[in-house]
Amino acid sequence: MAKKAKSRIINVRLISMAMTGYFYTFTRPRTSLPMSMLKYDPIVRRKVLFLEQKRKGRS
């Protein structure tokens, strides 16, 4: 049997670099570079850098 084709769009989780545990979820094309952006973190009440988290435990 042939393998299932991978989706062109993936869901990614952006984690706060303030280490508060707050995150945003976005969709991006699989071929694009990993996301990073400045967004508002309500726990520290300021804009902080959010970086894309590596997927763990998926096979």
From Swiss-Prot:
The keyword Mitochondrion applies. The keyword Hydrolase does not apply. It is found in: Mitochondrion. One of its GO terms (biological process) is translation. Keywords: Mitochondrion, Ribonucleoprotein, Ribosomal protein. It comes from the Eukaryota. GO terms for cellular component: mitochondrion; ribonucleoprotein complex; ribosome. GO terms for molecular function: structural constituent of ribosome. Its main location: mitochondrion. Component of the mitochondrial large ribosomal subunit (mt-LSU). Mature N.crassa 74S mitochondrial ribosomes consist of a small (37S) and a large (54S) subunit. The 37S small subunit contains a 16S ribosomal RNA (16S mt-rRNA) and 32 different proteins. The 54S large subunit contains a 23S rRNA (23S mt-rRNA) and 42 different proteins. bL33m stabilizes the tRNA acceptor stem in the E-site. Component of the mitochondrial ribosome (mitoribosome), a dedicated translation machinery responsible for the synthesis of mitochondrial genome-encoded proteins, including at least some of the essential transmembrane subunits of the mitochondrial respiratory chain. The mitoribosomes are attached to the mitochondrial inner membrane and translation products are cotranslationally integrated into the membrane. Belongs to the bacterial ribosomal protein bL33 family. This is Large ribosomal subunit protein bL33m. It comes from Neurospora crassa (strain ATCC 24698 / 74-OR23-1A / CBS 708.71 / DSM 1257 / FGSC 987). The lineage of its organism: Eukaryota, Fungi, Dikarya, Ascomycota, Pezizomycotina.
